[in-house]
Amino acid sequence: MTDLPILHVKNLGKADYQPVWQAMKDFTDGRDAHTPDELWLVEHPPVFTQGQAGKAEHLLAPGAIPVVATDRGGQVTYHGPGQLVAYPLLDLRRLKIGVRELVTKIEQSVVALLAEYKIDSAPKADAPGVYVNGDKIASLGLRVRKGCSFHGVAINVDVDLAPFNQINPCGYAGLNMTRLVDLVDTTKQPVVFSDVAKRYTRILSNILGLTAQLKE
């Protein structure tokens, strides 16, 4: 068996967006050439996040949901309970991959995850993320600093999709969102959030060529 580099996996449970964002920045700023890569898994309370390309007009009616201007790529999106948010904190130089290749690998990992639930999905060349019959199930936004990535991907498991109607998701007016629980016959294959997270961790680490190891 080949000794693959370690990917430390941290399950953060339910955690507010801003402290996790700050922790990602601190981790990235503090890491060196020997720091193992990490994957953080989290569910955020309801929040809209604006990417660096975000435009105010895409926030149609945020209402009581807070809006956070963040430093990731992309436009506005929604995070909420029932959405698996995965933050791969990776040394891209060490992995010898570029940003575009990382985006592709993350999209491939979501496609492979959905295939385990017998769902056909695909990325779009002009709109990062993963789609099922034109409806978006996973949103993606990254930042790279010092050759290291942070931010990541949000996969709709059983999240309430209604808040997406309060924005133009990722800057696209009328973009329909979907979620895993609505695409699976749950009488035959139950959708359990913790199981989805475990499957995704296994798939992403394999695609990256890393060995997942749980970190408390």
UniProtKB/Swiss-Prot annotation:
Catalyzes the transfer of endogenously produced octanoic acid from octanoyl-acyl-carrier-protein onto the lipoyl domains of lipoate-dependent enzymes. Lipoyl-ACP can also act as a substrate although octanoyl-ACP is likely to be the physiological substrate. In the reaction, the free carboxyl group of octanoic acid is attached via an amide linkage to the epsilon-amino group of a specific lysine residue of lipoyl domains of lipoate-dependent enzymes. Pfam families: LplA-B_cat. Its EC number is 2.3.1.181. PROSITE patterns: BPL_LPL_CATALYTIC, LIPB. Transmembrane segments: none annotated. Keywords: Acyltransferase, Cytoplasm, Transferase. Residues 33-212 form the BPL/LPL catalytic domain. GO terms for biological process: protein modification process. SUPFAM superfamilies: Class II aaRS and biotin synthetases. The active site is at C170 (acyl-thioester intermediate). One of its GO terms (molecular function) is lipoyl(octanoyl) transferase activity. Substrate binds at R72, G73, G74, Q75, V76, T77, Y78, H79, S139, L140, G141, G152, V153, A154. GO terms for cellular component: cytoplasm. This is Octanoyltransferase. The keyword Cytoplasm applies. InterPro entries: aa-tRNA-synth_II/BPL/LPL, BPL_LPL_catalytic, Octanoyltransferase, Octanoyltransferase_CS. It is found in: Cytoplasm. The record marks K136 as: Lowers pKa of active site Cys.
